[in-house]
């Protein structure tokens, strides 16, 4: 009985000491996370690039472009309303690993990705309608960030919440435990509100939205742009000025009366069919 009475205070003391050490370590870990995420809140460019590479936002683009002020501005605009809240911190001292659960507050990345996909499609159509055939019509990484910049500058996106976890690893330096955030693709995607996943989603736009962007872009082209896009010169394939005038007149006719309405959509696997009524000139009547 005396042994039990002696052991109980000892065990209680050990438990208190362990909890105290663990609490101290959790506080240190929280401070590391706060320090890094506060730099994102304060639009620190170096910290942004540490966790979110501007090239990895568009992983399919292999272009190695220099980090420009325009690209930096995109991240500044994106993170201007960024915030976070630490929910829980757990430490595994044996494995020198810690995990911090967070709630992130970011702009609505899905809405931004939808707008970007529409803007990119318009940009690609505009390139095809350009009369400067010597220019490379490939969409560059800088073009993509230019579009993001325009969207973030001209639109106000809602703030959304997202839960995520951050893993930290420990190392010993001068008999002191140093905690460091482990950079992962998942963390990168979480910090930008899922933007990386949304931008790579081929279904981010519905079939009808895709067709709507396409037809609306055609409808709003100038006569010259429409002629370039339709390759009007190939309609007559001749130097005859009368036939060239006819081709130009046809393009002018399309430009004046072109209209559309979109109907039902059916989707089967990777294929979609969208019904649309197109208003244009009566080609049969002209040819006859």
Model-derived features: where do they sit?
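Bacterial N-terminal signal peptides that target proteins for export
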Residues: 1-8
């Amino acid at each position: 009985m005396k042994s039990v009475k002696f052991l109980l205070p000892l065990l209680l003391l050990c438990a208190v000491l362990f909890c105290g050490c663990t609490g101290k370590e959790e506080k240190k870990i929280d401070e590391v996370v706060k320090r890094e995420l506060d730099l994102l809140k304060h639009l620190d460019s170096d910290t942004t690039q540490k966790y979110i590479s501007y090239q990895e936002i568009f992983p399919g683009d292999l272009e190695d472009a220099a980090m420009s002020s325009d690209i930096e501005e995109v991240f500044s605009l994106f993170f201007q309303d960024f915030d976070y809240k630490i929910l829980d911190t757990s430490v595994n001292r044996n494995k020198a690993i810690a995990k911090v659960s967070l709630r992130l507050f970011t702009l609505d990345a899905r809405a931004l990705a939808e707008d970007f996909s529409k803007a990119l499609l318009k940009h690609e159509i505009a390139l095809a309608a350009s009369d400067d055939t010597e220019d490379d019509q490939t969409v560059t990484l800088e073009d993509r960030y230019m579009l993001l910049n325009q969207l973030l500058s001209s639109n106000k996106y809602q703030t959304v919440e997202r839960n995520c976890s951050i893993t930290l690893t420990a190392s010993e330096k001068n008999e002191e435990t140093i905690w460091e955030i482990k950079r992962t693709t998942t963390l990168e995607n979480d910090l930008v509100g899922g933007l990386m996943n949304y931008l790579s989603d081929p279904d981010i736009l519905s079939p009808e939205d895709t067709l709507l962007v396409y037809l609306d872009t055609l409808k709003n082209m100038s006569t010259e742009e429409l002629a370039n896009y339709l390759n009007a010169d190939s309609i007559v394939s001749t130097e005859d000025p009368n036939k060239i005038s006819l081709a130009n007149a046809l393009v002018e006719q399309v430009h004046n009366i072109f209209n559309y309405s979109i109907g039902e959509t059916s989707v089967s696997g990777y294929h979609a069919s969208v019904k649309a009524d197109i208003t244009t000139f009566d080609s049969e009547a002209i040819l006859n």
